[in-house]
UniProtKB/Swiss-Prot annotation:
Family matches, as CDD domains: PKS
SS bond partners: none
SMART domains recorded: PKS_AT (SM00827), PKS_KS (SM00825), PKS_PP (SM00823)
Modified residue annotations for O-(pantetheine 4'-phosphoryl)serine: S1758
Domain notes: Multidomain protein; including a starter unit:ACP transacylase (SAT) that selects the starter unit; a ketosynthase (KS) that catalyzes repeated decarboxylative condensation to elongate the polyketide backbone; a malonyl-CoA:ACP transacylase (MAT) that selects and transfers the extender unit malonyl-CoA; a product template (PT) domain that controls the immediate cyclization regioselectivity of the reactive polyketide backbone; and an acyl-carrier protein (ACP) that serves as the tether of the growing and completed polyketide via its phosphopantetheinyl arm.
UniProt protein name: Non-reducing polyketide synthase nscA
Domain Carrier residues, every copy: 1721-1798
Pathway(s) the chain acts in: Secondary metabolite biosynthesis
Residues covered by region (N-terminal hotdog fold): 1322-1458
Organism: Trichophyton rubrum (strain ATCC MYA-4607 / CBS 118892)
Amino acid sequence: MDSTLRRVVFFSNEFPSDDLKELFRRLDQHSKDRRFRLLSIFLEESTAVLKDEVSKFPRPLKELVPPFDSVLGLVDVDFRQGPLGAAMESSILTILELGLFIGHYESEDTEWDLVPGESVLAGLSIGILAAAAVALSSSLADVAKTGAEAVRVSFRLGVYVADISTKLEAPQSDGTLSSWAHVVTEMTEASVQDELKQFNTDTHSPELTKVFISAADKTSISVSGPPSRIKAAFQHSPVLRYSKSLPLPVYDGLCHASHLYTQSDIDFIINSAESVILPDRSVRLALLSSQTGKPFIAKTASELFLEIGTELLTGTIYLDNVTAGIVQHLQPQSKETSSWQIDSFRTSLVLRGIHSAVEANLSGEQRQLIRRDLVSWVNRDFGPRRPRSYASSKLAIVGMACRLPGGADDLDLFWKLLEEGRDTLTTVPPDRFDLNTHYDPTGKTENATQTPYGNFIDRPGFFDAGFFNMSPREAEQTDPMQRLALVTAYEALEMAGVVPGRTPSTHPSRIGTFYGQASDDWRELNASQNISTYAVPGGERAFGNGRINYFFKFSGPSFNLDTACSSGLAAVQVACSALWAGEVDTAIAGGLNVITDPDNYCGLGNAHFLSKTGQCKVWDKDADGYCRADGIGSVVIKRLEDAEADNDNILAVVLGASTNHSAEAISITHPHAGAQKANYRQVLNQAGVNPIDVSYIELHGTGTQAGDAVESESVSDIFAPVTPRRRPDQRLYLGAVKSNIGHGEAAAGIASLLKALLVYQKNLIPMHIGIKSEINPTIPKDLERRNVGLAMQNTPWPRPAGKKRLAVVNSFGAHGGNTTLLLEDAPERVKIQGTEDRITHAILLSAKSKKSLQANMESLLSYLDQHPETSLADLAYTTSSRRMHHNMRFGTSVSCISGLQKALRSQLDNPNFASEVRPVPNEAPSVILAFTGQGAYYHGMGRGLFTEFPYFRAQVQQLDRLAQRLGFPSVVPVIENSIEDTPSSPILTQLSVVILEIALARFWSLLGVSISAVIGHSLGEYAALAVSGVISTADAIYLVGRRAQLVEERCAQGSHSMLSVRASEDAIQEMLAAEPETALIAYEVSCCNTNQDTVIGGFQGEIDDIRRALEAKSIKCTILDVPYAFHTAQMNPILEDLETLAKAIPFKAPSIPVISPLLATVIYDVKSLNASYLRRATRETVDFAAAIEATQDMGLVDSKTMWIDVGPHPICAGLVRSMIPSAPVMSSCRRNEDSIATISKSLVTLYLAGLNPCWAEFFKPREREYSLLHLPKYRWNETDYWIPYIGTWTLDKAHLKHGTKPTTPFSVSMSRPSALRTSLVHQITAETVRTTTATLHTISDMQHPDFLEAIHGHTMNKCGVATSSIWSDMAFTVGEYLYRRLVPNTKDVHMNLTDVEVLHAQVASKTKGSVQPLVLRAHLDLSTSSMSLSWFNADGETGECAAESFATATILFEDPGAWRKEWARLAHLVLGRIEVLEQRATEGKASRLSKPLAYTLFKNVVDYADRYRGMDSVVLDELEAMAEVTLVPERYGTWHTPPHWIDSVSHLAGLVMNGSEASNTRDYFFVTPGCDSFRLLEKLEPGARYRSYVRMFPLPEDPNMHGGDVYILQGEEIVGVVGMIRFRRVPRLLMDRFFSPPTTTSVAGPVPPLAGATTKCHDIAQTAPALPTPTPPIVVSNPIVSSTLASKALEPAPLLATSSGDSTPKEPPIVTPAESERAGPVDNNMISQCLRLMARETGLEVEALTADASFVQLGVDSLMSLVLSEKFRAELGVEVKSSLFLECPTIGEMTAWIEEYC
């Protein structure tokens, strides 16, 4: 503070010439920065004062004040020009001047410098109130408090004056403001007073309304009075009429009117201010009166405000007096006064006059007049905002992801779609619902849609269930919106580089999810067709967010919001609010919409929301409604300061977000311009942004007449007003993404936001394609004049240098909600260019499946090929520190991009990649630290870590300070390599090694490595003991240093030496003893490092002799570079003193197990660790080898245990590897290698073993130098979990109100025409055809005459059973149909039907008139030339499709030429075998069967109808046979290939298995579960002759299974092959169980399982993690036939429930007398019988059926379970469920159960 400075602070009664709103915006923006803490407090207090005062208004006045959250809301032009605007001017001016005053000081960060006596305050009119707040303050903090009370007084004064004045003269009816004061120049006060007196007299003016002088000086006079009276006065007086006069901006009424106000008025204003701060406050600074120019005499605040109030209301302003008072104050008081300063708020005529007067009066002084502007600071940029609170923060969007129509499954594809101006309009795909039945443009069909159009995402059902820990059943039942919310949330988090817990802002407890969703199509339609366990968690909206939180383990809030069409952006707004409120630190937000339900189409259409003509025609004159769309989008949002601290990529910044409601609209669905504008103002005020600065708006833009008109009005009025107009360079561009991708409803807002974010990234506004004809005439006509319009072509949107672009995103809800988001550019990031010391970098990739890992590697390789400039360091940072890691892993350490590409290609080119890659274990392997001895010492050890990692450096320096305080030399020069390259003293050597090792151990802990045990080699044992907590770090350093001193003092250097010998201790002794010259040489074993690595010590000469002797025997020997022979007798002189020193040291139990090389054991307690231990460890042998063996013997170590060598060079690592060759060993440092590269490689090894290093710490020291790369997203291992809507029940329910019963959906669909209809394929229910893919769903009725006849042609157990040839024909039918849909000009389609697997036989119902539907789903992919097929049962009443398929297959579309070549090579072999069979039949060695005989043999299992009996004769020789075949000429229906023809040429294999003497057909029958392939070179011909040949053989992997190839020949040529057709042996007693007709058409139990059904052991473990108590048996005499699926046998039996719902198992039921013989107590005889029966049926010995033997291990699968349950019933009379063998998984549990219940 300059004591020689005289100062005046002048508070004007006029606003600065700047834009008032902009000044307040800047104040508001600065107040959110922690630099301006007091400014923020003042503005908040002032706002609170105004709200308090307004709350006291009477209702009529209160209604004139709009709601406001800050003063900024009251500065709008509309309000200031309103009825109360003028009255508020005084308080607004007070707030402005005080805010600028406070902000000036805070911007300069200067101390309070207003000193009483040296500083004086002055002001005019209302400005004196602001000055009064400063006069009452002794600090800037005081001004923030007193200022709010000054605002209160000014507010009350302004309102009071306005109220009194309006009683004198009413305001203009049109709202025009009139001035209450005029200024007259070039006249004296007396002459003006004479004219006014004459006017008042002549017009007989009442005293209250007279015109009077309110202010005067030498050059001007202010005349005040009611506006009309002033006008009349100037017209009445010729002198005034022709004088120079101007109206003043005084609109609030009359002040300075002694005739109007009395002391009671003043008391009412001042004394009712209800201040709690000011009564006891005294005046600190002189404040000059604007009437007298002298300081007010008041001593207290209340006195001061009364004086000021009196002057403002009754006193006249004399500016000359004010000027004189200022000049007098500035007169030099002493010779030390060097300058004068006048602080003001900009300049004005009054202020210039004061400046002139001061300069004139002080012109003779050799001093300087300083003019300081208190406004200029407000426009300065103070750098990045440092938010004062969460609410003051800007927000950063750091990640995003999407699934949008038009194939926009990622952001690049979405942008490409926008940039190309594509329209994604299409008709409703068949997989959603059938337009043939649900579309009626006339509107006559109830519940039908009147529009067929929409915009749909590709593959909505595809999902990686395994990744998200969901079973296929749960995934299928889970709403695709929820699934894709999970997927896009992950992708957005991945893009953002979020690793939960990496930083404080990403701690799982501080992450929340916010999603908008406005429909429940999947739950209400698709999943409701078969309500299952997962109906609620899979369909209820709350679970969408909850599932994200649960999967990622986020414990922040989880909100699912429905605000209709604005849901997505409203969810973002709520997320922003949560961030501003401090409820979360990271938010994931988005919108969800997947359309499936035709009901919603119908409802929206009937409400006239939807266009009947197509896409959303935004701003088009023909706009007729919106077009529906799918959409899923997710964004990740943080507070800006957190995003910058986390080194995130910031896509854009959110300045403000708000949602309001159109409460005043004409109807609930009609938009309201006023509400929209209010919302814009709220957002702009929240951010302190000028609407003119906004240059892009993404409209809600639905393409409705009302919506477009209202939004165009609201947008133009706020962002492009008529005045002030936008400059030519301030073009406002508009866009509407709905014209491209339709209206995504709940996802619409998030789609708009994603587009806006991409616009920021690409610096380009995509073309608007919504205007198809001409612009809508309801749009304002003057938009172009306002410089606003749609971007009709791709328009560059460059970022101005040094500035930020502003954009707005709108989203409105049909219910009346309006949500608006205000965005700005991300801060320009200047990447710190450091010196890249890291030469080697770790690149990591991971996945949850092998397929995904491979795809991730391929995508990264592709990315690198396309971006060869990629920084390896950035790539390493991104793939390690900024990724969530999974159990399938790839990792490598490389030094260049080309090296990485080579490593990736090497892995991808490996044909065994899939088999070699293995998931890391769920439980990471243990890690052991091995601390080396001093032999690894060298200068500069650990230097790279010391330089690069502050944490490591701090640890070394901390330990070094301890060493120095203990009196030892500093080791830092050794590590820095700043010491001379000369041999170091033992003290420095040993301390350096130990300190380095302790620091390294702590560094490994920092990197997230948990230690399981430690082992130290010689000197390294001190570090190991310190790290394990046995001794303190200081004690370890002390003992090592003192030991080294003792060695130097007591032991002679060079007298002894140590020799490392590559041989065992025994071998050395034997070799030395064998030679006379060495037999008596004395030496000691210092170390047994491994079984073949020994260190000996002794006198130097003797050790040299030993070395020569051993080397002569070709034994590798090395003299160690140590000055002493440790662990020998040379150490004896120090032992006593060392032990004495150690006895003073406290020893504690190890916190980490210590592996002792001295004791060759693992130490867990403190008993063995003491001073004596250290003495012995110094003197005795280091038996490292025995210690390692002990760890193995004790189970502490196995082949997977990780070993980290902690020391300057990996010596212990080599020893461990010698002892355990398979052990993974790593290094911390390595001589002549960059230590950072060494650590990096070790971390990769740990990572690949299953540990999760803390990569964030590894990159933390230089994180600012790295950039997060936007790499290709995770590649999902997806499966289609789509449940199609079957039938027309949404239409049929309309009949219920008429009392009519709707027909079943299936029968309705059967009656409709279909593009594909054959005898087996009856109706297409869904069809989607895209460029390279196609999907088809069909439905068929097995009771249809054609189908039923085909089934009854193949009967088993007197039941019609569908033969595999039926599935073959259906597959070929849909295969050719779909292929021709994609490749229409194909001449012939050749199909290879592969991987046919029939899990459950289909038995025709015997109920007449029943419906027995089945569904076939097919998906063709041209890129792989393959088509997958699945068959499902469906419910005959509801059309509900079963959750699981009963049969599957794959068709490969192949070149028949390859078949022909393949078969040509085989033909001679097959023909040769046929000839052999013929010859053996002729010789009587094989059986020749006639047609009747052959089919009679077949009747053992199957009875064929005549049309199926194509074999004319058969030659059968055990498991080999050939047949002559003639096909019946009749097709008997419409087929691709008639089943009776397929069966005729192929069922020879069935005859071999069921008719050959080689098969036990008495006890067993054989059925086929499928084949590997079925190919026909040409279509079978009616009446044609063929030959079939087959040779069956047992399959080694399954003794119950046979397989073989059936060759079909025409002449000498093979024309077809059924490859590896399989037959399973089934006990004949299960015939009834498998082949009985269903009694119901429910999908819950359509048919029994086919004998070929199998379940793997691991499937059992997955499906039944916990088993309930087994159900007791029911002992009955008659069999109970189960109709459950085979898979049901593997499910736990439900507990018996009581009527009250109790799930406690019931007691066994009472049995009938006939049953009672078996119902009594069961002795061990029953157990024995059960075990013998089981042994017989499984082929095992009874001895193998031990109590702990599991049925899985014994090979008791689902089929064997059925056999055993039947045998138990038939032979033992005990009825048990086959699931018993799952519920009781071991023999012991089963026998215990039998004892309990049998």
